[in-house]
Protein backbone atom coordinates (compact mmCIF):
# COMPACT_ATOMS: atom_id res chain seq x y z
CA UNK A 1 0.00 0.00 0.00
CA UNK A 2 1.08 3.57 -0.68
CA UNK A 3 -0.85 5.11 2.21
CA UNK A 4 0.51 8.54 3.11
CA UNK A 5 2.35 9.18 -0.14
CA UNK A 6 1.39 12.43 -1.86
CA UNK A 7 1.72 12.24 -5.63
CA UNK A 8 1.09 14.83 -8.34
CA UNK A 9 -0.01 13.37 -11.67
CA UNK A 10 0.45 16.18 -14.18
CA UNK A 11 -1.02 15.71 -17.66
CA UNK A 12 -1.09 12.61 -19.83
CA UNK A 13 -3.37 10.46 -21.94
CA UNK A 14 -5.42 7.27 -21.44
CA UNK A 15 -2.34 5.48 -20.07
CA UNK A 16 -2.34 7.86 -17.11
CA UNK A 17 -5.81 6.69 -16.11
CA UNK A 18 -4.46 3.22 -15.36
CA UNK A 19 -1.68 4.76 -13.28
CA UNK A 20 -4.18 6.86 -11.32
CA UNK A 21 -6.44 3.83 -10.80
CA UNK A 22 -3.56 1.72 -9.48
CA UNK A 23 -2.24 4.40 -7.14
CA UNK A 24 -5.65 5.26 -5.69
CA UNK A 25 -6.32 1.55 -5.09
CA UNK A 26 -3.12 1.57 -3.03
CA UNK A 27 -4.45 4.57 -1.07
CA UNK A 28 -1.96 7.19 -2.20
CA UNK A 29 -3.10 10.83 -2.05
CA UNK A 30 -3.25 12.04 -5.64
CA UNK A 31 -3.38 15.55 -7.09
CA UNK A 32 -4.54 15.56 -10.71
CA UNK A 33 -3.58 18.38 -13.06
CA UNK A 34 -4.90 18.47 -16.62
CA UNK A 35 -7.86 16.17 -16.04
CA UNK A 36 -10.71 18.70 -15.68
CA UNK A 37 -12.60 17.19 -18.66
CA UNK A 38 -12.43 13.69 -17.20
CA UNK A 39 -15.88 12.62 -15.98
CA UNK A 40 -14.66 9.60 -14.05
CA UNK A 41 -13.78 10.25 -10.43
CA UNK A 42 -11.10 8.47 -8.41
CA UNK A 43 -11.38 8.04 -4.65
CA UNK A 44 -8.49 9.84 -3.01
CA UNK A 45 -7.71 11.96 -6.08
CA UNK A 46 -8.24 15.73 -6.20
CA UNK A 47 -8.46 17.70 -9.45
CA UNK A 48 -6.66 21.03 -9.32
CA UNK A 49 -4.52 23.37 -11.37
CA UNK A 50 -0.76 23.21 -11.13
CA UNK A 51 -0.44 26.24 -8.84
CA UNK A 52 -2.80 24.63 -6.31
CA UNK A 53 -0.54 21.62 -5.74
CA UNK A 54 1.07 21.69 -2.26
CA UNK A 55 4.52 21.05 -3.74
CA UNK A 56 6.14 21.28 -0.28
CA UNK A 57 4.41 17.99 0.60
CA UNK A 58 4.75 16.13 -2.71
CA UNK A 59 6.71 12.87 -2.63
CA UNK A 60 6.60 12.26 -6.38
CA UNK A 61 5.61 13.94 -9.64
CA UNK A 62 4.39 11.74 -12.49
CA UNK A 63 4.56 13.32 -15.95
CA UNK A 64 3.25 11.92 -19.25
CA UNK A 65 5.32 9.52 -21.31
CA UNK A 66 6.26 12.47 -23.54
CA UNK A 67 7.47 14.48 -20.49
CA UNK A 68 7.30 18.17 -21.50
CA UNK A 69 8.03 20.32 -24.52
CA UNK A 70 11.25 22.31 -24.68
CA UNK A 71 9.34 25.14 -22.98
CA UNK A 72 7.98 23.00 -20.16
CA UNK A 73 4.45 22.58 -21.53
CA UNK A 74 2.88 19.29 -20.45
CA UNK A 75 0.55 17.39 -22.78
CA UNK A 76 -3.01 17.29 -21.41
CA UNK A 77 -5.41 15.12 -23.41
CA UNK A 78 -8.20 15.60 -20.85
CA UNK A 79 -7.94 19.39 -20.62
CA UNK A 80 -7.71 22.49 -22.80
CA UNK A 81 -5.70 24.21 -20.09
CA UNK A 82 -2.05 24.94 -20.84
CA UNK A 83 0.01 23.37 -18.09
CA UNK A 84 3.63 24.45 -17.68
CA UNK A 85 6.03 22.76 -15.26
CA UNK A 86 8.47 25.38 -13.98
CA UNK A 87 11.70 25.45 -12.03
CA UNK A 88 9.89 27.07 -9.11
CA UNK A 89 7.54 24.10 -8.79
CA UNK A 90 10.41 21.65 -8.34
CA UNK A 91 12.31 23.98 -6.02
CA UNK A 92 9.40 23.82 -3.57
CA UNK A 93 9.32 20.02 -3.36
CA UNK A 94 11.03 18.05 -0.56
CA UNK A 95 14.57 16.87 -1.29
CA UNK A 96 13.40 13.25 -1.62
CA UNK A 97 10.79 14.04 -4.31
CA UNK A 98 11.25 11.90 -7.44
CA UNK A 99 10.07 12.92 -10.92
CA UNK A 100 8.92 10.21 -13.32
CA UNK A 101 8.47 10.53 -17.07
CA UNK A 102 8.66 8.19 -20.03
CA UNK A 103 11.37 10.07 -21.86
CA UNK A 104 13.09 13.38 -21.18
CA UNK A 105 14.53 16.47 -22.83
CA UNK A 106 17.03 19.21 -22.08
CA UNK A 107 14.43 21.44 -20.40
CA UNK A 108 13.22 18.80 -17.95
CA UNK A 109 16.68 17.51 -17.18
CA UNK A 110 17.90 21.05 -16.56
CA UNK A 111 15.16 22.06 -14.10
CA UNK A 112 15.46 18.71 -12.29
CA UNK A 113 19.22 19.15 -12.00
CA UNK A 114 18.87 22.76 -10.82
CA UNK A 115 16.40 21.65 -8.15
CA UNK A 116 18.61 18.65 -7.31
CA UNK A 117 15.70 16.27 -7.76
CA UNK A 118 15.96 12.73 -9.10
CA UNK A 119 14.51 12.26 -12.59
CA UNK A 120 13.57 8.71 -13.62
CA UNK A 121 13.08 8.02 -17.35
CA UNK A 122 10.85 4.98 -17.29
CA UNK A 123 11.36 4.02 -20.92
CA UNK A 124 15.06 3.46 -20.25
CA UNK A 125 14.19 0.60 -17.90
CA UNK A 126 14.56 -2.91 -19.32
CA UNK A 127 11.38 -4.20 -17.72
CA UNK A 128 9.14 -1.51 -19.21
CA UNK A 129 10.81 -1.70 -22.63
CA UNK A 130 10.38 -5.48 -22.77
CA UNK A 131 6.75 -5.38 -21.61
CA UNK A 132 6.05 -2.56 -24.08
CA UNK A 133 7.50 -4.62 -26.93
CA UNK A 134 4.34 -6.77 -26.79
CA UNK A 135 1.83 -4.05 -27.77
CA UNK A 136 4.49 -2.58 -30.06
CA UNK A 137 4.74 -5.74 -32.14
CA UNK A 138 0.95 -6.06 -32.25
CA UNK A 139 0.74 -2.51 -33.57
CA UNK A 140 3.48 -3.24 -36.09
CA UNK A 141 1.58 -6.27 -37.38
CA UNK A 142 -1.53 -4.09 -37.68
CA UNK A 143 0.35 -1.51 -39.77
CA UNK A 144 1.92 -4.19 -41.95
CA UNK A 145 -1.51 -5.65 -42.72
CA UNK A 146 -3.11 -2.26 -43.34
CA UNK A 147 -0.44 -1.04 -45.74
CA UNK A 148 0.25 -4.13 -47.85
CA UNK A 149 -1.78 -6.30 -50.21
CA UNK A 150 -0.01 -9.55 -49.35
CA UNK A 151 0.27 -11.78 -46.31
CA UNK A 152 3.02 -11.48 -43.75
CA UNK A 153 3.43 -15.23 -44.17
CA UNK A 154 6.01 -15.78 -46.89
CA UNK A 155 7.03 -12.12 -47.10
CA UNK A 156 10.63 -10.95 -46.95
CA UNK A 157 11.15 -8.93 -43.78
CA UNK A 158 14.23 -7.08 -42.53
CA UNK A 159 14.35 -5.97 -38.90
CA UNK A 160 16.98 -3.38 -38.03
CA UNK A 161 18.26 -3.66 -34.48
CA UNK A 162 18.06 -6.53 -31.97
CA UNK A 163 17.32 -4.51 -28.88
CA UNK A 164 14.45 -5.11 -26.50
CA UNK A 165 11.86 -4.24 -29.16
CA UNK A 166 13.69 -5.59 -32.20
CA UNK A 167 14.03 -9.05 -30.70
CA UNK A 168 10.29 -9.37 -30.03
CA UNK A 169 9.45 -8.11 -33.52
CA UNK A 170 11.87 -10.46 -35.25
CA UNK A 171 10.64 -13.48 -33.30
CA UNK A 172 6.95 -12.68 -33.85
CA UNK A 173 7.19 -11.99 -37.58
CA UNK A 174 9.14 -15.24 -37.99
CA UNK A 175 6.41 -17.07 -36.06
CA UNK A 176 3.87 -15.69 -38.54
CA UNK A 177 5.79 -17.32 -41.36
CA UNK A 178 7.78 -14.37 -42.67
CA UNK A 179 11.32 -14.87 -43.92
CA UNK A 180 13.13 -12.67 -41.43
CA UNK A 181 16.65 -11.33 -41.49
CA UNK A 182 17.97 -9.03 -38.80
CA UNK A 183 20.61 -6.33 -39.01
CA UNK A 184 22.81 -5.59 -36.02
CA UNK A 185 26.32 -4.42 -35.17
CA UNK A 186 27.54 -6.30 -32.13
CA UNK A 187 28.92 -9.80 -32.49
CA UNK A 188 26.75 -10.90 -29.55
CA UNK A 189 23.59 -9.76 -31.33
CA UNK A 190 24.64 -11.40 -34.58
CA UNK A 191 25.23 -14.63 -32.68
CA UNK A 192 21.82 -14.36 -31.00
CA UNK A 193 20.12 -13.83 -34.37
CA UNK A 194 21.69 -17.04 -35.62
CA UNK A 195 20.62 -18.88 -32.46
CA UNK A 196 17.05 -17.70 -33.07
CA UNK A 197 17.10 -19.40 -36.45
CA UNK A 198 17.01 -16.11 -38.35
CA UNK A 199 19.37 -14.66 -40.94
CA UNK A 200 21.91 -12.21 -39.48
CA UNK A 201 23.70 -9.41 -41.29
CA UNK A 202 25.90 -6.52 -40.22
CA UNK A 203 24.28 -3.11 -40.65
CA UNK A 204 27.37 -1.95 -42.57
CA UNK A 205 26.08 -4.26 -45.33
CA UNK A 206 22.52 -2.91 -45.13
CA UNK A 207 22.50 -1.60 -48.70
CA UNK A 208 22.95 -5.13 -50.06
CA UNK A 209 20.28 -6.64 -47.82
CA UNK A 210 17.37 -4.33 -48.64
CA UNK A 211 17.24 -4.99 -52.37
CA UNK A 212 14.66 -7.78 -52.22
CA UNK A 213 12.64 -7.11 -49.07
CA UNK A 214 8.92 -6.46 -48.75
CA UNK A 215 8.88 -4.92 -45.28
CA UNK A 216 11.68 -3.12 -43.44
CA UNK A 217 11.12 -2.53 -39.72
CA UNK A 218 13.54 -0.12 -38.08
CA UNK A 219 14.13 0.17 -34.33
CA UNK A 220 17.46 2.04 -34.47
CA UNK A 221 17.14 5.72 -33.41
CA UNK A 222 19.71 7.11 -35.85
CA UNK A 223 19.75 7.85 -39.58
CA UNK A 224 20.29 4.32 -40.86
CA UNK A 225 17.88 4.31 -43.81
CA UNK A 226 19.66 7.11 -45.64
CA UNK A 227 19.67 8.02 -49.33
CA UNK A 228 22.33 5.44 -50.17
CA UNK A 229 20.35 2.61 -48.58
CA UNK A 230 16.98 3.79 -49.90
CA UNK A 231 18.39 3.91 -53.43
CA UNK A 232 18.80 0.14 -53.24
CA UNK A 233 15.17 -0.46 -52.23
CA UNK A 234 12.35 -1.09 -54.66
CA UNK A 235 9.16 1.03 -54.47
CA UNK A 236 7.24 -2.07 -53.29
CA UNK A 237 9.06 -1.98 -49.94
CA UNK A 238 7.12 -0.80 -46.90
CA UNK A 239 9.19 0.89 -44.19
CA UNK A 240 7.85 0.87 -40.63
CA UNK A 241 10.09 3.09 -38.51
CA UNK A 242 9.45 2.49 -34.81
CA UNK A 243 12.36 4.57 -33.52
CA UNK A 244 11.79 7.70 -31.46
CA UNK A 245 11.22 10.89 -33.44
CA UNK A 246 12.63 11.88 -35.86
CA UNK A 247 13.23 8.18 -36.59
CA UNK A 248 16.02 6.58 -38.58
CA UNK A 249 14.69 7.15 -42.11
CA UNK A 250 15.17 9.91 -44.68
CA UNK A 251 11.42 10.25 -45.22
CA UNK A 252 11.63 12.94 -47.89
CA UNK A 253 13.97 10.85 -50.02
CA UNK A 254 11.82 7.75 -49.48
CA UNK A 255 8.80 9.65 -50.79
CA UNK A 256 10.83 10.82 -53.77
CA UNK A 257 11.71 7.19 -54.51
CA UNK A 258 8.07 6.13 -54.27
CA UNK A 259 8.69 4.11 -51.11
CA UNK A 260 5.97 4.16 -48.46
CA UNK A 261 7.66 4.96 -45.14
CA UNK A 262 5.72 5.39 -41.90
CA UNK A 263 7.08 6.84 -38.67
CA UNK A 264 5.29 5.00 -35.89
CA UNK A 265 6.78 5.59 -32.44
CA UNK A 266 4.68 5.13 -29.32
CA UNK A 267 2.55 2.30 -30.65
CA UNK A 268 1.64 0.90 -27.19
CA UNK A 269 -0.22 4.08 -26.29
CA UNK A 270 -2.04 4.05 -29.63
CA UNK A 271 -3.06 0.43 -30.08
CA UNK A 272 -3.34 -0.70 -26.44
CA UNK A 273 -3.45 2.30 -24.07
CA UNK A 274 -5.02 0.27 -21.25
CA UNK A 275 -2.31 -2.40 -21.34
CA UNK A 276 0.43 0.21 -21.82
CA UNK A 277 -0.93 2.12 -18.82
CA UNK A 278 -1.04 -1.02 -16.69
CA UNK A 279 2.60 -1.73 -17.53
CA UNK A 280 3.59 1.73 -16.32
CA UNK A 281 1.30 1.53 -13.29
CA UNK A 282 2.73 -1.78 -12.08
CA UNK A 283 6.32 -0.60 -12.31
CA UNK A 284 5.54 2.81 -10.81
CA UNK A 285 3.76 1.28 -7.82
CA UNK A 286 6.88 -0.76 -7.02
CA UNK A 287 9.19 2.25 -7.38
CA UNK A 288 6.91 4.40 -5.23
CA UNK A 289 6.79 1.68 -2.57
CA UNK A 290 10.58 1.89 -2.44
CA UNK A 291 10.36 5.65 -1.92
CA UNK A 292 7.81 5.07 0.83
CA UNK A 293 10.08 2.56 2.56
CA UNK A 294 13.06 4.91 2.39
CA UNK A 295 11.08 7.78 3.88
CA UNK A 296 9.47 5.54 6.50
CA UNK A 297 5.95 6.60 5.60
UniProtKB/Swiss-Prot annotation:
InterPro entries: AlaDH/PNT_NAD(H)-bd, Dipicolinic_acid_synth_A, DpaA_N, NAD(P)-bd_dom_sf. Gene3D superfamilies: NAD(P)-binding Rossmann-like Domain. It is an enzyme of class 1 (oxidoreductase). One of its GO terms (molecular function) is oxidoreductase activity. It holds the Pfam family AlaDh_PNT_C. Dipicolinate synthase likely consists of DpaA and DpaB, since both proteins are required for DPA synthesis. This is Dipicolinate synthase subunit A. It comes from Bacillus subtilis (strain 168). The gene is dpaA.
Amino acid sequence: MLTGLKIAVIGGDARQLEIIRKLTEQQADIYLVGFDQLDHGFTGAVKCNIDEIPFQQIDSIILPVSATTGEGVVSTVFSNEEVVLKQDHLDRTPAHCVIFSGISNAYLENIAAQAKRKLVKLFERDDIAIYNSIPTVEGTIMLAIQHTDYTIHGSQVAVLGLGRTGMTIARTFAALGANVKVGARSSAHLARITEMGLVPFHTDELKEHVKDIDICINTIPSMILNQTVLSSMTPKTLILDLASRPGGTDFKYAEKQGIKALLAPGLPGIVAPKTAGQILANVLSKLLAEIQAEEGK
